[in-house]
A protein has these predicted regions:
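GST-like domain detector, emphasizing the conserved glutathione-binding G-site
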Residues: 1-111
Length: 111
């Protein structure tokens, strides 16, 4: 079954997930969510994402939301294919640096 990504192609968070999928050479289907029509706030969408945000990953019925969580899930699921995006499990220094940069970028500081 092909992964389904519910999101908006112009959304930064959706694009983050699509970038990871491209780096991992993973097949997926983008299910468009029209943010200008507020589709993410609908009762049907909130079954998938209770906060009404995009993106949402559907992996054979297993739903993951929050773009960074989706990206980590995909990086581990497809660890053996495409670009290596996260450190190995036992690489303590690698994880420390990874988290440091992740937190730094999340706060929006670039210099």
């Amino acid at each position: 079954m092909v992964l389904k990504i519910y999101g908006a192609a112009h959304s930064t968070c959706t694009r983050r997930v699509l970038t990871v999928l491209a780096e991992k050479n993973a097949e997926y289907e983008l299910i468009p969510v029209n943010l200008s029509k507020n589709e993410q706030a609908s009762a049907a969408f909130r079954v998938k994402q209770p906060f009404g945000k995009v993106p949402v990953l559907d992996d054979e019925g297993f739903l993951v939301y929050e773009s960074r969580a989706i990206c980590r899930y995909l990086a581990r699921k497809y660890a053996g294919q495409g670009t290596r995006l996260i450190p190995d499990e036992g690489d303590v220094r690698g994880w420390g640096l990874f988290e440091q940069v992740s937190l730094f970028l999340r706060e929006g500081r670039v210099g």
